[in-house]
């Protein structure tokens, strides 16, 4: 499958089997997981990306009426999507999720040797001219306070801790529901975990406190 588990097997199954929220041609839509596949290269390495569920949170609601198209895709090594499509649809394991879980849990190894790749692309009119902006980065595991941490552990914790720091400093609403998009990249960069977000910002953005 060109894949190994670094987190929840059930979480991966949900991402690959549940409908995905999106905005298509200006309208809220539900698109199918594993569809919308595209290929791209980052630092000379090839990747594929395809629809998966759950990544946008409330962003479709926030950007309704402001963007024409919005989607969220998971990045994998080439060939992974086709193998999963065979399992889910060729063998119809999407209809038997417990069996799918047993197959994946027994056949796909768990590993702490991982890498997180983030790529964000936006296009639109600026000054009457169509422009596209792309930001991308990759993060690998690293030691933290005497223990080796995986890339998914570091990036997941960084998002949570960055948001907590912004909340504690009064930079986020102090009551009510707080959306993930209210934590701007520029604000997150100025937190103690800001180095994990630095590559996603323009080079001219002011540096923040990136200490551990």
Which sequence ranges carry the predicted segments?
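C-terminal catalytic/substrate-binding lobe primarily of soluble NAD(P)-dependent oxidoreductases
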Residues: 1-212
């Amino acid at each position: 499958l060109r894949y190994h588990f670094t987190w929840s097997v059930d979480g991966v199954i949900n991402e690959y089997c549940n409908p995905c929220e999106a905005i298509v041609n200006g309208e809220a839509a539900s698109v199918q997981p594993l569809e919308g596949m595209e290929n791209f290269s980052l630092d000379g390495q090839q990747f594929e990306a395809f629809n998966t569920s759950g990544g946008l949170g409330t962003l479709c609601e926030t950007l309704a009426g402001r963007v024409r198209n919005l989607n969220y895709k998971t990045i994998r090594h080439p060939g992974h999507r086709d193998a999963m499509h065979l399992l889910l649809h060729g063998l119809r394991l999407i209809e038997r999720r417990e069996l799918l879980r047993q197959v994946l849990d027994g056949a796909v190894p768990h590993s702490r040797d991982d890498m997180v790749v983030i790529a964000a692309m936006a296009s639109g009119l600026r000054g009457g001219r169509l422009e596209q902006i792309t930001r991308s980065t990759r993060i690998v595991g690293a030691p933290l306070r005497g223990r080796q941490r995986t890339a998914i552990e570091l990036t997941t914790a960084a998002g949570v801790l960055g948001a907590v720091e912004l909340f504690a400093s009064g930079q986020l609403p102090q009551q009510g529901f707080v959306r993930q998009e209210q934590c701007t990249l520029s604000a997150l960069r100025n937190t103690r975990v800001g180095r994990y977000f630095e590559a996603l910002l323009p080079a001219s953005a002011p540096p923040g406190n990136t200490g551990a």
